[in-house]
Amino acid sequence: MHYPEPISKLIDSFMKLPGIGPKTAIRLAFFVLTMKEDTVLEFAKSLVDVKRNIRYCTVCGHITDTDPCYICKDERRDRTTICVVQDPKDVIAMEKMKEYNGLYHVLHGAISPMEGIGPEDIKIAELLKRLQDEAVQEVILATNPNIEGEATAMYISRLLKPTGIKVTRIAHGLPVGGDLEYADEVTLSKALEGRREL
């Protein structure tokens, strides 16, 4: 189908976003045509503002508009504990729980030999430097419960063993409200391994 050039460019731009295929891109482009101009300009300004003003915290790697980020600046947080996550979205998920009060370290990925991503391609060296400079007593490995996340956690755990810092791994288990019969074997196994005394 042939579209006027501005619409074709907009469709192509939308298709660069993750999870947006041709049909959704076309639908979004035509929706933009129905929007008021000031709404479109505000949307475009928001995109530019995010790109210009959001960066990664030089301490932990989380997204921020100030450096260091609000978490690293907060003196009320437990500075003896660092939770290591793969992605800034993981920090946001952890913060929503309102149960963790320590600091974070964002790796920006996970070790994945199949994709050519090694330890040097993620922020492990920065983590090791932080651990030398700060009085950390515990590192919580909260990488994803998949092959890459587990490999990354094991790699970091082995690196930290000689330091004497306590290294823990978040337990992976059944979702609240989930039925045992619908859980896969790995989830059940991890739930059993991560059990705690009541």
From Swiss-Prot:
Superkingdom assignment: Bacteria
ZnF (C4-type) intervals: 57-72
Annotated GO biological process: DNA recombination; DNA repair
CDD domains, per database record: TOPRIM_recR
UniProt cross-references to SMART domains, sorted A to Z: TOPRIM (SM00493)
Annotated ranges, domain Toprim: 80-175
UniProt KW keywords: DNA damage, DNA recombination, DNA repair, Metal-binding, Zinc, Zinc-finger
Record GO terms (molecular function): DNA binding; zinc ion binding
Cited InterPro entries: DNA_Rcmb_RecR, Rcmb_RecR, Rcmb_RecR_Znf, TOPRIM_dom, TOPRIM_RecR
HAMAP family xrefs: RecR (MF_00017)
Function (record text): May play a role in DNA repair. It seems to be involved in an RecBC-independent recombinational process of DNA repair. It may act with RecF and RecO.
UniProt similarity note: Belongs to the RecR family.
Name used for this protein in its record: Recombination protein RecR
Organism whose genome encodes this protein: Geobacillus sp. (strain WCH70)
GN (gene name): recR
